[in-house]
From Swiss-Prot:
Domain HTH luxR-type: start-end pairs: 109-174
Disulfide bonds: none
Classification lineage: Bacteria, Pseudomonadati, Pseudomonadota, Gammaproteobacteria, Enterobacterales
A biological process from GO: regulation of DNA-templated transcription
Function, as annotated: May act as a transcriptional regulator of dctA.
GO MF: DNA binding
Binding region for DNA: 133-152
Keyword line: DNA-binding, Transcription, Transcription regulation
Protein name per UniProt: HTH-type transcriptional regulator DctR
Calcium keyword on record: no
Highest taxon, organism lineage: Bacteria
Induction (free text): By acidic conditions. Could be induced by EvgA via the induction of YdeO.
Length: 176
């Protein structure tokens, strides 16, 4: 069984046509996940305008104990699902490489050029969603010094001179 987590109906239709050999289920919100029915599924997550990380959605996915998770994202997030095998792929992956990845054979999938820790991605998502510093500190339960350290590292990784340049960053749609 394949669970496709996306808000993009065109993306789901394309995945359904590519994965015609199996049972394909479209999931748009966390209430649609059935822990018993979808147990040990193969999960495909599209993060474009659908940032499921750091939410109840991700904990629901973890409870499914998926066989493998493929995430369409320009970011590589280290240990985002604990011990569940996760592969991050760009949306520009070829169909041949994607099918090879699904079948478990070797393919030359280009890795994301931006690799973040789980906490860095969480801080970045909060900043992209225009949360205030105080709200971020309260939500993530971190100190101001830790926040500034994460913010500085994120700016270095993304090549930003000022954090407000994040609004014009090419991958901002994957964070909201």
């Amino acid at each position: 069984m394949f669970l496709i987590i996306t808000r993009d109906t065109m993306f789901f239709t394309a995945m359904k046509n590519i994965l015609s050999k199996g049972n394909v289920v479209h999931i748009q919100n966390e209430e649609e996940i059935d822990v018993m029915l979808h147990q040990n599924a193969f999960v495909i997550i599209d993060t474009l305008m659908n940032n499921v990380f750091h939410s109840n959605f991700l904990t629901q996915i973890e409870r499914l104990k998926p066989v493998h998770v493929i995430v369409f994202s320009p970011f590589n997030i280290k240990r985002c699902l604990g011990k569940v095998p996760v592969t991050f792929v760009p949306r520009t992956i070829t169909i041949i490489d994607f099918v090879a990845l699904i079948n478990g054979s070797y393919c030359s999938v280009p890795e994301a050029n931006v690799s973040l820790s789980r906490k860095q991605h969480q801080v970045l998502s909060c900043i992209a969603n225009q949360m205030t510093t105080e709200d971020i500190l309260e939500k993530l339960k971190i100190s101001l010094k830790t926040f500034y350290c994460h913010k500085h590292n994120i700016m270095m990784i993304l090549n930003l001179k000022r954090i407000n340049e994040l609004v014009r960053h090419q991958h901002i749609d994957y964070l909201v």
